[in-house]
Amino acid sequence: MGGEVRVLLLLGLLHWVGGSEGRKTWRRRGQQPPQPPPPPPLPQRAEVEPGAGQPVESFPLDFTAVEGNMDSFMAQVKSLAQSLYPCSAQQLNEDLRLHLLLNTSVTCNDGSPAGYYLKESKGSRRWLLFLEGGWYCFNRENCDSRYSTMRRLMSSKDWPHTRTGTGILSSQPEENPHWWNANMVFIPYCSSDVWSGASPKSDKNEYAFMGSLIIQEVVRELLGKGLSGAKVLLLAGSSAGGTGVLLNVDRVAELLEELGYPSIQVRGLADSGWFLDNKQYRRSDCIDTINCAPTDAIRRGIRYWSGMVPERCQRQFKEGEEWNCFFGYKVYPTLRCPVFVVQWLFDEAQLTVDNVHLTGQPVQEGQWLYIQNLGRELRGTLKDVQASFAPACLSHEIIIRSYWTDVQVKGTSLPRALHCWDRSFHDSHKASKTPMKGCPFHLVDSCPWPHCNPSCPTIRDQFTGQEMNVAQFLMHMGFDVQTVAQQQGMEPSKLLGMLSNGN
């Protein structure tokens, strides 16, 4: 009983400071806050048992009242949450549990039922649906090879019964400060079609490609599990899942409207799925997924999968050119739903399909110039993206990594930028174009080479496993200090010092 009382006191404190969703109090700077009414008496045990009455709202906190001392306040909240955690741990199950779709006609590649992992949060009206990534296959030969080596990405037969959420799917406030209490849904990738397909397995088709239909069926099923009362649905994804967000976010919103739930705010979070249809560093034949140029692979894939793209984007291109909509900078301007784009400026998957390999032999000058140009090109495509987070790092995927809170752009972390974006909506479907003071959400690094941001994830030598600082990493790649210092108009010693400090 003592643990429950402490939990109620904590919730009362948070409610007074931040307010729950939909009941935020705004005032001009300097204006005295209204005095809070006296607290109601603590409810009896019977009134707080699960399922009784209306659920308590979740707490995406409004920090307007504590803007001057945010770090101290967050430290206190985290300390309270950690101290109370043992009191409630026995009642909480942090794992997401597997649910195979009841509609067994919506399947993985091999015809086994698709599904999702769910962790419900009865007090929250926010839902986070995450689309897993994992490349794709685009013809019978490389799909057969994929089935032999990566069957988990084509079949549900060996999926575990539970998963533990990490990063933005974590239920730990210290790892996931603003979404920890949301309803979490992890949708495994088993369609190999960048979440675009709509074709079942048949006598003619050895494999089903139903990625887009899987998303729709999961949403339909979740309506009966509490999604019908949602205020916000955030469709998130990494890599192929990030591209899947761009392809499906409007379709999810349209489905909810058709089913009678137009008030649910649908938003997107696309991580590491914003690819460029640029020329490869070295042209190669389109034989397998890794070596095939992005445009060639998607051209072939969209036919093989019977892939679907957003209707408004499709109208921008003539018949047979729908593949263009798989590239973020082309589909983004056509989307109705707001989308937050997270993209490393030097994405490892992009460099792989561009035939730039950064391991083994030192990088040649032509490769180095190609890499720098890639960063400039990608930065340019994000210029008009209202909400973005793009660190100058060599990496791939971030939002479900446990270190996702550590990376910063211009002094702001990704969770903080997402929270600022959340706050910009207030109670509307559209975000304010002007961020609140001290709360930015368009953050793109301006430094020109991989890992010039000191908060980038750790680099390790692939042979020794030893950590490398930025200077060591660039030297390992064959970085010519003299030449680059000359290009930048500075002394080589000064350049090395800047690199060692991560500037």
From Swiss-Prot:
Enzymatic class: hydrolase
Signal sequence region: 1-19
Cellular location(s): Secreted
MF (Gene Ontology): lipase activity; palmitoleyl hydrolase activity; protein-containing complex destabilizing activity
Active site: 239 (charge relay system), 347 (charge relay system), 396 (charge relay system)
GO CC annotation terms, alphabetical: extracellular region
First-listed, main subcellular location of the protein, grouped into a coarse class: secreted
Residues glycosylated per entry: 103
E.C. numbers: 3.1.1.98
Result, substituting residue 239 to A: Abolishes enzyme activity. Unable to mediate serine depalmitoleoylation of WNT proteins
Catalytic reactions on record: [Wnt protein]-O-(9Z)-hexadecenoyl-L-serine + H2O = [Wnt protein]-L-serine + (9Z)-hexadecenoate + H(+)
Keywords: Glycoprotein, Hydrolase, Phosphoprotein, Secreted, Serine esterase, Signal, Wnt signaling pathway
Residues bearing PTM Phosphoserine: 88
Biased composition (Pro residues): 33-43
One GO biological process term: regulation of bone mineralization
Family: Belongs to the pectinacetylesterase family. Notum subfamily.
Function: Carboxylesterase that acts as a key negative regulator of the Wnt signaling pathway by specifically mediating depalmitoleoylation of WNT proteins. Serine palmitoleoylation of WNT proteins is required for efficient binding to frizzled receptors.
Protein name in UniProt: Palmitoleoyl-protein carboxylesterase NOTUM
Species this protein is from: Mus musculus
Species classification: Eukaryota, Metazoa, Chordata, Craniata, Vertebrata
